[in-house]
Structures are given as structure tokens and as C-alpha cells.
Amino acid sequence: MSLNLENQGNLIAKVMKNEKDTNMKLYVTDKENTVRNGGNSFECKPDKSLQIVPNNKTERQCLYVCGQSGSGKSYFTTNYVKEYKKMFPKRNVYVISSIAEDKSIDSLKPKRINVLHPDFMFDEFTAEDFKDSLVIADDVDVFPTKIKKKYLQLLIVFFR
């Protein structure tokens, strides 16, 4: 595997400076012989950062974002959603959560599914409901047990 800035392989991230795109893009390839200056690690300069971008060459992509309260999970997710909406402006974004709002993510106008709403337990979701969309599951660890079971059934639908 080789990380590179040479447009070889799959795009995985953009190099940002002050939240602005620098036009440098990070790629990953397993064809190491096609890359002149690749490597197995990449380090940004102190004034730059990486923004993960959706992979439009795969049918499905799953990210697991975790961290302590205040660590920047919503900030990271919001920026990822912005990149997703740039690539796929007509696709839906869903937030499945027990929390009524998240100002950061809600600024992007996702469709919210509140797991604490009484209808959630009776809604029958299909894979078609979420086809070609981005689904964010927020604070699943605090879902009541009964709702977690329903949510896990929903995950099975997603991955079929």
C-alpha cells in the first residue's frame, strides 16, 4: 500500500489549510510501482490538516467516528457531510439519533430519525429507503436497550 499525492489510486483525503482546500489530494494505491514518491505514512505540516472524503469508487463505505465528549466528532462529521454533499448534491443525509438536535450537523439540513419518537419502534425500514444516501448514527451508546435492538435490525437492512 502506498499513500501519495500523485493522483494514483483512490482519493481518500484533501489537504486543508485554515479549512480551505489546498488542491493537494491524498491517494492510496496497492500498485506501489506506479508511484514515484509514495509511502506508508503521511504527515501534514503543522498549519495543514486532512479532510477525509467519500470514496465514489465503492458501493458502500463505512466510517466509525468515536471519541470523548468535546473531541470533535460532530466537527469531523459535519466536514465529511459537506464533502459528501459536494460530491453527491442530490443525495439524502439521514441522522439517526436520540438527541433532538446537533447544531453543527443540523446546519446541513439532514433528515432526522428520532429513535425516541414512538413511531420509530413501528416503522418498517427497507434498504431502498436509504439507497444512495449517507446515514449517521449518533450517540447509539445511550439508546435504551429496546431501541438498540431495533437499531441493530436497521443496520442489518443497511448491509444487505
Predicted features and spans:
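Conserved SF1/SF2 helicase motif Ia
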Residues: 88-90
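Signal-peptide-cleavage-adjacent N-terminal segments of secreted and extracellular proteins
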Residues: 18-22, 64, 92
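N-terminal pre-Walker A segment at the start of P-loop NTPase domains
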Residues: 3-54
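Residues immediately N-terminal to the Walker A/P-loop in ABC ATPase nucleotide-binding domains
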Residues: 58
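Conserved P-loop NTPase motor cores
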Residues: 61-83, 94-103, 111-160
